[in-house]
Amino acid sequence: MFLPTTREEMKKLGWRELDVILVTGDAYVDHPSFGVALIGHYLVSHGFKVGIIAQPDWRTEKDITRLGRPRLFFGVTAGNVDSMVANYTASKKKRKTDDYTPGGSGGKRPDRATIVYTNLIKRFFPEVPVVLGGLEASLRRFAHYDWWSEKVRKSILIDSKVDLLVYGMGEKAVLEIAQILSRTGDIEKCKSVRGVVWWSSQKPEGGIELPSYDEISENPEKYAEALKLQTWYTDPYKNILIYQKQDTRYVVQNPPQLPLSQEELDRLYLLPFEREVHPFYAKMGRVKAIETVKFSITAVRGCFGSCSFCALTQHQTTHVSYRSKDSILEEVRILTKKKDFKGTITDVGGPTANLYGSSCSIRETKGQCQKFCLYPSVCKIVRPNHDEFISLLESIRKIPGVRNVFVSSGIRHDFVLAEKDPDVFIRELVKYTPGQLKLAPEHAHPKVLSLMRKPPVELFLEFKRRFETLAKKIGKRKYVIGYFIVGHPGEGWRENNYLRDFILKHLGYFPQQIQIFTPTPGTVSTAMYYSGLDPFTGEKVHVERSLKVRNKMKENVLFKKKGREKR
């Protein structure tokens, strides 16, 4: 079932008005990999009428008014990615293309889309509550360093002039907001909901106070301190309120929602998604973003890898939840009935596929302890369950109509190597790899890897050796390729040349999977970039801020110039 995007579609459903209208910076793709589709179907499954306005023209009222006034609220998201990341390259050049836009052309979503869409709504529907959500809002919920303007900005809640922001995976919080507004019509009563951020003119009682906006704007050390506190105390099982003074107001973060249970996840992903681009947008052109996920399966949520540069850990938390085998197999059966299904499940995973079935007795009862689960090595309390993941893949492959099952969404090779006999899993993984297994060592120099919270590169080489040896034994030509980041805090020319030499010596190919680090809001790495400090150790960190030098670092690793750079 597609959710309505026009009045005509509302009439076909017999709906005179909508309870909630969701506004997004992406094209409307009715697939569970797209947040608006998830939230929309979740609300509909609980009896609410929901419509979607995707990529509205922000220069006119034509799009934003086409569904009328919602009974309860507008929900606003920039889309699956931060709008500034969507619109600009790592060199701050305007992108000409956008995979989330029909036809692939850039310019269909504004910079700082959450703020722009909210202002548009307030212009034409000033009395209707607006609730922010999605990655852009979630990662900008407190004062944050904005690389594109090179300054610390206030919470997007303040900049948008709204009352409520949902952070993290928002199904439960959005449903509670809808239920409260339906009963009372009072947005103030929604400020008790877990997983929301709100503002107050009064200082909250209790909780953790972060350094203020003024403090972190003037003192980078305070910025690093604020990020550390936010990271440690944003945990559903610690149940702690966090707040930050911004001018005369306080931005208040309620404790996160508890992760969805397995039963809740199962029901969510089996809602009646069309798994297609909505016809209203499909007629405007191809939406490239659906092509890699259309026949994929989300099996896992959350990741306890805690990579410094990763926004997903900050957004989905370190708490891993996963779906039951029965639910996943039912979704596969649904996919096999699609007319354009050609027998291949392109991915079974999530942020990190092989965390499926894993557990930790401490995290599940007391919350994240003040240690990293996988850094500097895999914690002994964390329990992997690779057997269950392989059993799941085998069961999928036996379903009539399925010829291939692949794992494409990331494997933590250090987690595999922590097993007593890693080859048991690796041997099976070979069968579920489409020619090349993509891993993310990210760098080679020990200092940079330590700041990234990534394992030693020797573990990548060990996994690569085992994988390719086992593939060869069964007569398969399958290889491991690596993804790398340059320009991350801690990298200078010495570390960059170290990475170049590592690739030349150990990989034997010219890599194309090189990206320049982009300081996105809310991550540990961005705190390092702004402050020049490691938030968790207080140690000084070298930061390369020159765009010209960062581009040269990429060229150096891509072997576009002969010889090593000398600096």
Swiss-Prot record:
Residues where [4Fe-4S] cluster binds: 303, 307, 310
Cofactor binding summary note: Binds 1 [4Fe-4S] cluster. The cluster is coordinated with 3 cysteines and an exchangeable S-adenosyl-L-methionine.
Top-level taxonomic group: Bacteria
Keywords: 4Fe-4S, Iron, Iron-sulfur, Metal-binding, S-adenosyl-L-methionine
InterPro entries, per the entry: Elp3/MiaA/NifB-like_rSAM (IPR006638), rSAM (IPR007197), rSAM_horseshoe (IPR023404), UPF0313 (IPR022946), UPF0313_C (IPR024560), UPF0313_N (IPR013704)
One GO MF term attached to the UniProt entry: iron ion binding
Domain Radical SAM core: 288-560
Required cofactor(s): [4Fe-4S] cluster
Family classification: Belongs to the UPF0313 family.
Protein name as annotated: UPF0313 protein Tpet_0582
Species of provenance: Thermotoga petrophila (strain ATCC BAA-488 / DSM 13995 / JCM 10881 / RKU-1)
